[in-house]
Amino acid sequence: MNDTVTIRTRKFMTNRLLQRKQMVIDVLHPGKATVPKTEIREKLAKMYKTTPDVIFVFGFRTHFGGGKTTGFGMIYDSLDYAKKNEPKHRLAKHGLYEKKKTSRKQRKERKNRMKKVRGTAKANVGAGKKKD
């Protein structure tokens, strides 16, 4: 890891309702490329004395001219709370969620079955039951 990279946190807030700490993260990296999120997570884990798996960082934007990147971070009290509150796409990036993917043919058949009915009956058709 680079020693020239500095991580600062602003607008720190403890969100007891969602069992997490949330903050704006400023990464100062003069003369260097944007710091990888994994490295930011590791440094935050060291700063807040926790493990990197409960830290979620996102929304990073590098300022014009480089040298400073700003993003958002959340540190959950436990992994269970993170799984409950984080969006599925962010969990998938961490490898904590696997989307069940139906085959293309099944999706198309379901779409065409749903075209044949109107209103609340679509829910029954969408569940996989055939209309008689």
Swiss-Prot record:
GO terms for biological process: ribosomal small subunit biogenesis; translation. Residues 101-119 have a biased composition (Basic residues). Keywords: Cytoplasm, Nucleus, Ribonucleoprotein, Ribosomal protein. Its main location: cytoplasm. GO terms for molecular function: structural constituent of ribosome. It is found in: Cytoplasm; Nucleus, Nucleolus. GO terms for cellular component: cytoplasm; nucleolus; ribosomal subunit; small-subunit processome. InterPro entries: eRP_eS24_sf (IPR053709), Ribosomal_eS24 (IPR001976), Ribosomal_eS24_CS (IPR018098), Ribosomal_uL23/eL15/eS24_sf (IPR012678). It holds the Pfam family Ribosomal_S24e. Residues 90-100 have a biased composition (Basic and acidic residues). Coiled coil: none annotated. It comes from the Eukaryota. Residues 90-132 are annotated as: Disordered. Belongs to the eukaryotic ribosomal protein eS24 family. Component of the small ribosomal subunit. The ribosome is a large ribonucleoprotein complex responsible for the synthesis of proteins in the cell. Required for processing of pre-rRNA and maturation of 40S ribosomal subunits. Part of the small subunit (SSU) processome, first precursor of the small eukaryotic ribosomal subunit. Component of the small ribosomal subunit. Part of the small subunit (SSU) processome, composed of more than 70 proteins and the RNA chaperone small nucleolar RNA (snoRNA) U3. This is Small ribosomal subunit protein eS24.
